[in-house]
Amino acid sequence: AIRQGKFPKGTKETLLKQAHSKNPTTRFLATLQLAGQNHEGMPAVLASVLAANSHDRWTRAAVFSAAENAATDLLDQLATNPQQAQADTLKSLGRIIGKGRPQQELLSILQRHFGAKTPWPIASQIALLTGLADGVHGRNFSGTGKTTILMLPKGQPEALANTDGIFIAARKSARDK
């Protein structure tokens, strides 16, 4: 029945509990069913699912589907325990945020999640910025033409400094390898 998309019916509370299960299949199915539901604790639940199984691309897809418009909240939740977030997870989440969130929200992310005060290690910041750059590429904010991640923080000194710092760190990291 599950292969046809027919899941056992469960309450939101049951699904949130199942998302914390030790069984990866139970976690995955609960996460899939959480898509389209709103709950204030959803970002924390989704972050815990990612922490338990972020290496699995299907789990990541289920989490990102369930996050929908709460992708920025999910990123904020992941930042509370930054060592658990995998680079590929941050890159994918950054791409989703870059494609769908408004310009002001993206600028806020550049200010809060990058630079010296961020909880993320530099490799995570590079992965997140790469994803944001992929997502933002070609978007048209306020009729300004197609945007790149380099153009987004113009006129925002803190966001610009944070972005520049990540590019410098990425170049240094590439040279050191």
Predicted segments with their positions:
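Long, ordered, helix-rich scaffold segments
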Residues: 1-177
